[in-house]
Amino acid sequence: MAATSLTAPPSFSGLRASRAVVAMAGTGKGGAFTGEISVEQLKDIGRWVILGHSERIVVAYEPVWAIGTGKVATPDQAQEVHGLCR
């Protein structure tokens, strides 16, 4: 499971500790990092952590057949791939 910092505590109630996986953005030791979760806080929650800022990632898509050809995907084609990514 890769829960956000807002959903992690309620999500853990139904999981055994050995299966829990936590995904949150971690910061360095100490300091004031508004909106971030510290390493010390992460260690208290679970055994596994996905580090980084995946909530801030933007995914762009262009079909292989369209690259450098001047052809573009239709809105329906783009929506189909968007659905698969989600």
UniProtKB/Swiss-Prot annotation:
The keyword Isomerase applies. Its EC number is 5.3.1.1. The active site is at E62. Pfam families: TIM (PF00121). It is an enzyme of class 5 (isomerase). It catalyses: D-glyceraldehyde 3-phosphate = dihydroxyacetone phosphate. Keywords: Allergen, Gluconeogenesis, Glycolysis, Isomerase. One of its GO terms (cellular component) is cytosol. GO terms for molecular function: triose-phosphate isomerase activity. Pathway: Carbohydrate biosynthesis; gluconeogenesis; Carbohydrate degradation; glycolysis; D-glyceraldehyde 3-phosphate from glycerone phosphate: step 1/1. One of its GO terms (biological process) is glyceraldehyde-3-phosphate biosynthetic process. Belongs to the triosephosphate isomerase family. Homodimer. This is Triosephosphate isomerase. The lineage of its organism: Eukaryota, Viridiplantae, Streptophyta, Embryophyta, Tracheophyta.
